[in-house]
Amino acid sequence: MLLLERTKLVVEGAGAVGVAALRRAATVPAESGTTVVILSGGNIDTGVLADIARHHETERGRRLRVFTTIPDEPGSLAALLTRLGEGGANLIDIAHVREAVALSVGQTGVELVMETRGPDHTERILATLSEGGYSAKVLD
């Protein structure tokens, strides 16, 4: 992920061994001159790459998945989304869950996936939801 984030290069695991060795100090660069590390291979499944990126964002606190309930009436979803906007959340995906054992009559569930700026922003979003009367359960 380091190479992808910093250099925008897609390099398969074996092709990044030189960078890994330098980062772990397993190899010491020459005292004079320039050290060159060869990067090779971009043979990676794009679906796997997307999964890795999502996992990395979640791990770094830049992706938040929550489940909450809202009244099953017109305007409830709009009110929830307005609240999220006030918290600066960037909505990536939403699922409207109408049928679940845990839901009471007159309620509907909403699963939200949001992009955040980091752990502090995640906490602010959760606080904004709580202040708005929403009980949000963070999902893995």
Regions found by a protein language model. Name each.
Residues 10, 36-38, 67, 93:
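Structured core elements
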Residues 13-15, 41-42, 75, 106:
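Glycine-centered flexibility sites
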Residues 15, 23, 42, 116, ...:
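A broadly conserved detector of short glycine/acidic/proline-rich loop/turn motifs that flank catalytic sites
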Residues 17-22, 45-46, 79:
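Short, electropositive, low-hydrophobicity segments enriched in small/polar residues
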Residues 23-54:
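Catalytic phosphate/nucleotide-handling subdomain of diverse soluble enzymes
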Residues 46-140:
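A conserved regulatory-domain signal marking ACT and ACT-like small-molecule sensing domains
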